[in-house]
């Protein structure tokens, strides 16, 4: 009980006293709350304002220099893109099929470098900005078409236990004669000719296309440099060990 009484007395004590104050606190508080009161935050000196103005101008100037005007940017970018893009046309025979490829790639890409390094069967044509835009539009259309086809529900497959009143299953299972197939294939490939490539060459073409698509050429270059550096260090250490062993052998021979 005594502890509760002491606690209540402490809670009832005032937080501050104004008995010994030399100014009228209530009057000053009322004056500060008055609507026409001039008391408040101190005004900013003129010298400080003058110091802030050049700083803001400098910041604006730096931002203008960092971000150039937009009209020149796209034009320069488009010119650079047009001058570095090339069109690759390639025709080859793989797995019994004649394949014709035509694509626009950057000149410094892995696929373009491989094509320019040792492939004389195709052609490289500098492209313009309009052709790049057209090829990009075709790519987007093909992508949207593929996405549309992916979300379609596949049709129900015909079962041999289903009724067949129209004879469709017999027609689908009918074998075509080899002469008709050969004649049709020969007519289609009569005007298309190209070199025959093996699986290794086809894999190399697919790999460079994948490298350009994923954008990992820089990582592969750094990895190859690191690998060469490791092999070089190992070779150096092996040479040092061989030299030490030779010195030991010479010392033993001199001692004998």
UniProtKB/Swiss-Prot annotation:
Q: Which organism is it from?
A: Emericella nidulans (strain FGSC A4 / ATCC 38163 / CBS 112.46 / NRRL 194 / M139)
Ranges of biased composition (kind: Basic and acidic residues): 48-64
Q: How does it assemble?
A: Component of the SWR1 chromatin remodeling complex.
Subcellular locations according to the entry: Nucleus
> What family does the database annotate?
Belongs to the SWC5 family.
- The coding gene here is swc5
Signal peptide, first to last residue: none
Q: Keyword set for this entry?
A: Activator, Chromatin regulator, Nucleus, Transcription, Transcription regulation
Q: Could you name the Gene Ontology cellular component terms for this entry?
A: nucleus
Q: Where is the BCNT-C domain?
A: 177-256
Under what name is this protein listed?
A: SWR1-complex protein 5
* Disordered: region residues: 37-83
Name one process (GO BP) from the record. Answer: chromatin organization
- Functional description taken from the UniProt entry: Component of the SWR1 complex which mediates the ATP-dependent exchange of histone H2A for the H2A variant HZT1 leading to transcriptional regulation of selected genes by chromatin remodeling. Involved in chromosome stability.
Enumerate the InterPro entries for this protein: BCNT-C, Swc5/CFDP1/2
